[in-house]
Amino acid sequence: MTTAAQLRAESARLLTEKQGSSQGLVPTMGALHEGHARLARTAVEQNDVVVASIFVNPLQFGEAVDLDRYPRTLEADMELLDAEGVDLVFAPAVEEVYPGGEPLVRVTAGRLAGKWEGASRPGHFDGALTVVAKLLHYGIPGTGLPGGGAFVTGAGAGLPAYRAYFGQKDAQQLTLVRRMVTDLNFPVEIVAVPTVRSADGLALSSRNRFLSGEEREAALVLSRALRLLEERANAHEPLDLESAQALVESQPLVGLDYFDVVDPETLEPLAENCKETPFRGEGLAIIAAKVGPVRLIDNLPLSS
């Protein structure tokens, strides 16, 4: 499907046909891999009707060259989603999502957008939240039914439950989407799905295809550094972020952007408080680096 009207009509038809009580949305930019398959699989397990979207959002790319370079693999993506049991695929053109060109009004990510990924990619999260907001609106279940469109779902509302699925790998985006949904009263439950990794520990990413063999081997240092912090947290020891960072910086093909331990909800740094004393509570180790020409991000939840 390529239009919001088609999406609403077809999802309403399927909900009626299945006598469904829940609908899931899996927003993607395509170039799908096993991480996306896990998102789709989880959504199918938890909902009666599942919609996946494939849309390369121009608003979240800083440079046109990055947008042009992003891989488009629609046919393969459709096959993957079909194999996972997704009911509907929404693959709109840019003109469908932004019919008047770039929108005058956007969702702004606020102060959380200026740190970590946002510091390196100005405007990225404003663009990402704007398109997520639109996709969440398109996917509200029941709006294609006669009399549909009420901005309420769930038990007692007369409309199906509504869930949207995001990967833990994009931790800052996940945090911001959750805040947007809470602060702006979106009628949707955000479900986080754990990061999927290859057997050697590399977090799956659509960008991995651009790594040479040597660069891919070098990129493994990111997950190894995160695991060092996890081991220390599990052992109730000080985190020793400096040693983990030195491991990353010892790899000549890797240019470190940031590496820290933050509060999972506020994204404020925690590592400074854990240099001398054992780590306690919940945290999120986050890292970003350029490996050759490819920018990679990863993270790992910490608990002690």
Swiss-Prot record:
Binding site for ATP: 29-36, 167-170, 196, 204-207
Positions contributing to (R)-pantoate binding: 60, 173
Catalytic residues identified in the record: 36 (proton donor)
Entry superkingdom: Bacteria
GO cellular component, one term: cytosol
Compartments (UniProt record): Cytoplasm
SUPFAM superfamilies in UniProt: Nucleotidylyl transferase
Entry EC no(s): 6.3.2.1
Purpose: Catalyzes the condensation of pantoate with beta-alanine in an ATP-dependent reaction via a pantoyl-adenylate intermediate.
Assembly information from the UniProt record: Homodimer.
Identification of the protein by name: Pantothenate synthetase
